């Protein structure tokens, strides 16, 4: 607080100097600067900023506006499309970042592929069993029909013989 009072007379002289100088705009479009350089400047100026309450500081009447820098937007990262089908692990490791998450994703995809293959094998096995069962039931039905026909013929034969004797 004492420092603020000590700089009070200097601020009066700087106020008269700012009145004669033309006002600079508070916003600068600095598209030529690098992103990292701009962040270093803002952090350096932020470290010198005194953290006191605004009402505790006397109004010096400097009318100094803060400088705002708009940084150049970052270029987007190119999107990569890849499939784990028909690729070896070396190519996949080149594309994915070196983290544990990429290994988990690869392992999870391989597990999903194994589960899918197991389900396909089980469904094929079930289809084969069902086709064998269908063939078996079809054959059984045909044999039952044939036995019925033979039994009816045998039963009807005795009746037919009796009717033939009666006609004669």
Curated annotation (Swiss-Prot):
Coiled coil: none
Pfam families, alphabetized: DUF5528
Comp. bias regions, Polar residues: 10-23
Organism of origin: Mus musculus (Mouse)
Biased composition (Basic and acidic residues): 31-40
Protein name per its UniProtKB record: Uncharacterized protein C5orf52 homolog
Disordered as annotated region, ranges: 1-52
InterPro entries: C5orf52 (IPR038935)
